[in-house]
Amino acid sequence: MDASRSDVLILGGGVIGLACALYLLKAGATVRVLEQGTPGCGSSHGNCGTITPSHAAPLAMPGMLGVALRSMLRADAPLYLNPRFDGPRLRWLLGFARHCNWTDFHRAVEARSAILQRSRHMLADLIRDDRLDCEFSEAGELYVYRTEKVRAADERHHAAVLDRLGVEAQRLRGDEVEAMEPALKPGVAGGLFHPGDARLRPDRYVAELARRVRELGGSIESGAKIDRIDTQGDRVTHVRSTCGVFSGKHVVMALGAW
């Protein structure tokens, strides 16, 4: 067998690429992962590590287009768009605007909630069965509101949505939040506690995924910057990288947003 060929060639060694590799290896496939840096670097390494079925609401909702446009004035905005209107960006904004309605919002909420709930339980099973040492905690997540205005807005667009989905969200008074988290500055308006949420240490999680991939016989090529992808018709025939030329019966693109 050609050592550079595998059943599945995965481009990108972040959390998605490594998780795909692990499940494919368990299914009996031979797998090779190409990663331009080191396994799990980038955004898979540095993030808050929360696992949140409570975040079922999509970004596209009525009123959000105005938020997106106003964010162009603040480089530190949570949703920031560079105020440069080229073709692709304008098409994205128009598509985003078309989905900022309640019909699409509720349809997306139901689909996202189903995926989030299933993945939350699958993740717990994976961490337990493969003994992944990543500081996984199922203690829930607490969200704190400093003002009543923000709390009331989140009640309409967040907590009430979760109620309809059957996702538990516990409303807390300000004094209850302060009792739960004594280090908070007094004057909290209220809070939401999501007992179904979880968290982990993302850098440890991706390192553990990489460990299990190697233990099960998978290959991870670090420093493999992709130079070119050769195609024939609608199939990828070869992937040329700084670590060599590779191929696979199937190719998984897990290269991230950038």
Please place each PLM-identified region on the residue numbering.
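Short hydrophobic core segments
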Residues: 10-11, 34, 246-257
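Glycine-rich FAD pyrophosphate-binding loop
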Residues: 26-46
